[in-house]
Amino acid sequence: MPVNLPLPQADNLKPVAGVELGWAEAGIRKANRKDVLVVRVAEGSTVAGVFTRNRFCAAPVQVCRENLAGGKGIRALVINTGNANAGTGETGLANARATCDALAGQLGIAANQVLPFSTGVILEQLPMDRLLAGLAPAIANAKADNWLAAAESIMTTDTQPKAASRTVQIDGKTVTLSGISKGAGMIRPNMATMLGFIATDAAVAQPVLQALVSHAADHSFNSITIDGDTSTNDSFVLIATGKSGAAIDRADGPAFEALREAVTSLAQELAQMIVRDGEGATKLMTIRVEGGKDVAECRQIAYAVAHSPLVKTAFYASDPNLGRILAAVGYAGVDDLDVDRVNLWLDDVWVARDGGRNPEYREEDGQRVMKQAEITVRIALGRGNAEATVWTCDLSHDYVSINADYRS
């Protein structure tokens, strides 16, 4: 069961002027499920993205990078689930481009104005006949208020759709943002089997939009982990249609800061939804490391704790075996760390003080916190002013079962 994750309600998801979303049941891997999504984007919109750092990146990621760099103006996105089109060689690359060609032909745009995305099983070729047959019905039911159905159509091992909206006032105009995400396993973005899409009706210059998507990714999708694996297909895309009339043409000033905060907070909500729905997750842990020399070492330590199977299983068992956290801090790779200055809290419970057990710590207090569904682990390094936060989940028996049964 997801951790404190209510189902999104269609009425709470706001249309974004200039964006229409349509889905189809193409039977790419399983019958009778939404598995193709087409997103139509108004002419004149700007689009920016960040993608997986996995060197074995999937064919659609390569095509996305090419088409974004082409500067023709993106007019459509196409996403399929059930097949990652990764590890598929030249045939997979040709299939990704053929998908763009087919959608472009039906929409009357150029092929390099389409961004393709895939998620699912690696090392299998796309069933192109089924995928291409799904494009026309997806286009036919494209509507501005299809955000919930869109979220459903990009799910793989997710147990529920992930979608959210925001509005923000910029220069006296109401700016709307809506987004969807998917992912439940192989999540340690940089990115990881994670897709995220946010659209806004602000008018944003392309370089500014790229700065926005990069900042939002660093503070959201690149700050979560479920199992430490980095996928071949991760993508996070930001669309700005300009339909609200609120214009942002430089990466500073109050208007930029307001939109950056809105985009980042929405991305954080979508990213945390992924962790809350992590495969087999029963708890959400916030790992906050402070007092570091720089953000990089804080994040390095936070990820060491978040990735530790011993830490994650202790949280699953509600077992306050908290020396495991200190051990992870110690092997994180910060060679000049003075462990005698390290302090550790679970929520408001001070567990370790100056590198050792806090004399006032009682295990029953740690046990009380460990039984909660949401827990904050705070680690103070005592060597600077930098900080970083990572979100993760526990590791349960169900994680093994879900992944063992994934292809069956």
Swiss-Prot record:
Record GO biological process: L-arginine biosynthetic process; ornithine biosynthetic process
Residue numbers marked as site, Cleavage: 192-193
Site note Involved in the stabilization of negative charge on the oxyanion by the formation of the oxyanion hole, residues: 119-120
UniProt keyword terms in alphabetical order: Acyltransferase, Amino-acid biosynthesis, Arginine biosynthesis, Autocatalytic cleavage, Cytoplasm, Multifunctional enzyme, Transferase
GO CC terms: cytoplasm
EC number, as in UniProt: 2.3.1.35, 2.3.1.1
Subcellular location: Cytoplasm
Cited Pfam families: ArgJ
Record's function text: Catalyzes two activities which are involved in the cyclic version of arginine biosynthesis: the synthesis of N-acetylglutamate from glutamate and acetyl-CoA as the acetyl donor, and of ornithine by transacetylation between N(2)-acetylornithine and glutamate.
Subunit structure: Heterotetramer of two alpha and two beta chains.
Annotated protein name in UniProt: Arginine biosynthesis bifunctional protein ArgJ
Protein source organism: Cupriavidus pinatubonensis (strain JMP 134 / LMG 1197) (Cupriavidus necator (strain JMP 134))
Gene that specifies this protein: argJ
